[in-house]
Amino acid sequence: MDKLFKLKENNTSVRTEVVAGITTFMTMAYILAVNPSILSASGMDSNAILMATAIASAIGCFAMAFLANFPFALAPGLGLNAYFAYTVCGSMGYSWKVALFAVFVEGLVFIVLSLTNVREAIFNAIPTTLKKGVSVGIGLFVAFIGLQGANLVVASTSTKVTVVNFRTDFNTVGIGALLAVIGTFIIAILYVKHVKGSILIGIVATWVLGIICQLTGLYKVDAAAGFYSLIPSWRSFDITAISQTFGQCFNLKGLNINILDFIVIMCSFLFVDMFDTLGTLIGVANKAKMLDENGRLPRIKQALLADAIATSAGAILGTSTTTTFVESSSGVAEGGRTGLSSVVTGFLFLIAIIFAPVFTTIPGFATAPALIFVGFLMVSAVVEIDFNDLTESIPAYLCLICMPLMYSISEGIAVGVISYVIVNLVAGKAKKITPLMYVLALLFILKYIFL
């Protein structure tokens, strides 16, 4: 095991990696329930989507582990699945088979870009300070997702977002938000006390408290409002359902496809996936202290190749773009440093096929504390930004603030790259800007104009 994953070289142990892998899985297990609920709007079978999601995630995790030896987990990405279901199959009116084929082609393009070092060059072209900004921005973004998942932050017509009213719908929204607060303090206290597995313990403890609240009547099930039973229940699951989506991305006979539309769809998947993945790798790798003195990530080519392979494999199985998950940061926070962590996460995704009713019972308010706390850990990188150099700090600031407010890692990177080029040009520091940064800035601007 040590020889395969270089545990001693990375100052870790089997126990630490296993705990990290379990923690990562627990924080992203929600995708097993969320992805089918979104993609089923396209007409796909929800059971087939669940199986495709689990298997594609496992393939991605294994590829990341054995090709790159990184503790990064993969699964079908949120945002891209919504674009798949509601834009491509919804407003544009295309069959889900066409959408899957677009994802498959995108994956192939990614494989080519990874093998030809294009994606690696983009990663290395981003300035170190901007990478720090990406890491902080992802921390804020992850924390915001956690606050939303706990219903601590809710929508507001006047201010866009506001704090939850605990008294309104206390037995559903209120109690869940309160338990999330308690869970966050549990993790924080355990972390301060240097307890191993503090994040995982916090998730399980919050879930158990929720079950107790349900049994005592403090938490009430309201499926119509999205508040389900917290008590795991066994129900039959049709494992043959995946036959309804497997290989259907190639079954395009009789389907009308506008070539221009298809190119736009494929490029949209490609663009968002590329910079979401790069942003996640930058942020999580920075937190794990994996970047070298030049801000480069060793074995980045293999990591990007694993991501690309998982995308095409996922399309064949029957799911939208598979990408590196930002929730990997929770496992890194537990000490995960090698591919063994990813292997554990991958196996749990396979096991989840059998025990799907159990894993999909984990409530959002139980995993939210983990995301909120991981956000704190990632935001700590802000002290590494040199605020005395305004040509470096202003783009980093715009990058980190736009990620949570625009609810997108790729948009934050776009703003950061464009502002970096403009600020340094105006400041007379054009020599700092690499040719590839000019190209990226231009591509981002064109994206806002035409896509």
Residue ranges and their predicted role:
Residues 92-208, 212, 343-451:
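Membrane-embedded alpha-helical modules
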Residues 60-73, 189-191, 268-276, 307-317, ...:
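Transmembrane alpha-helix interface/packing and boundary motifs in multi-pass membrane proteins
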Residues 26-30, 67-77, 110-113, 194-195, ...:
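Short helix-coil transition sites and intra-membrane helix breaks within transmembrane domains
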Residues 40, 65, 69, 73, ...:
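Transmembrane helix-loop junctions in multipass membrane proteins, especially transporters and channels
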Residues 37-48, 87-98, 256-262, 361-363, ...:
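Helix-coil boundary and interhelical linker segments in multi-pass alpha-helical membrane proteins
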Residues 43-62:
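Loop-to-helix transition at the N-terminal end of transmembrane alpha-helices
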Residues 1-48, 166-167, 203-301, 445-446:
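Helix-loop-helix hairpins and the membrane-proximal interhelical loops
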Residues 2-35, 56, 77-86, 90-138, ...:
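Helix-loop-helix junctions within the multi-pass membrane cores of secondary transporters/permeases
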